[in-house]
């Protein structure tokens, strides 16, 4: 019987908001997750350079984007923005990625980590950590996105 070793993958998780993007990453075996400082969003997407630097520094091989679906699992305005940004990021970074339903991740991180009224981005990065932990448990696998994204920022 032949066994296949799982391919190591260090993943970046993004909790995308209108003002900031919370960030977290995991080790190659997806055992531990850590937060990174949240990055400010800029109109001209300068934050992609910062995200690229983290990807290079931590040797990350893919990323996941939290999609805030509503209670019925339907796309919200924010979910559409997150989806479009994820596709843009995949194109710019040339990395595989996946979407994860992050319904209530900010509420959960506020309760779980005791963070209230945060303007530093800490709650955003802890939300990214929760999204990452959910992805580690549930999947789905990362996918390559071919072609250029249709929506530009």
UniProtKB/Swiss-Prot annotation:
Pfam families assigned: RuvX
Gene Ontology MF: a single term: nuclease activity
Gene Ontology BP term (one): rRNA 5'-end processing
GO cellular component, one term: cytosol
Residue ranges the record marks as coiled coil: none
Keyword Nuclease on entry: yes
Record flagged with keyword Nuclease: yes
E.C. number: 3.1.-.-
Cross-referenced SMART domains: YqgFc
Cellular localization per UniProt: Cytoplasm
Keywords: Cytoplasm, Hydrolase, Nuclease, Ribosome biogenesis
Function per UniProt: Could be a nuclease involved in processing of the 5'-end of pre-16S rRNA.
HAMAP family per UniProt: Nuclease_YqgF
Family according to the record: Belongs to the YqgF nuclease family.
Name of the protein in its database record: Putative pre-16S rRNA nuclease
Species, as recorded: Prochlorococcus marinus (strain MIT 9215)
Classification of source organism: Bacteria, Bacillati, Cyanobacteriota, Cyanophyceae, Synechococcales
């Amino acid at each position: 019987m032949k066994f296949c070793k799982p391919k190591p993958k260090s993943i970046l998780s993004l909790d995308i908001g209108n003002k900031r993007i919370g960030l977290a990453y995991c080790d190659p075996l997806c055992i531990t997750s850590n937060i990174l400082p949240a990055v400010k969003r800029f109109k001209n997407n300068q934050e992609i350079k910062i995200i690229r630097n983290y990807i290079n520094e931590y040797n990350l091989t893919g990323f996941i984007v939290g999609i805030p679906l509503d209670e019925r699992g339907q796309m919200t305005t924010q979910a559409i923005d997150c989806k479009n940004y994820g596709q843009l990021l995949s194109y710019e970074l040339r990395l595989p990625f996946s979407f994860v339903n992050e319904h209530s991740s900010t509420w959960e991180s506020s309760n779980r980590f005791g963070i209230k009224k945060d303007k530093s981005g800490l709650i955003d990065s802890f939300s990214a950590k929760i999204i990452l932990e959910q992805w580690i448990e549930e999947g789905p696998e990362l996918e390559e996105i071919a072609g250029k994204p249709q929506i530009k920022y």
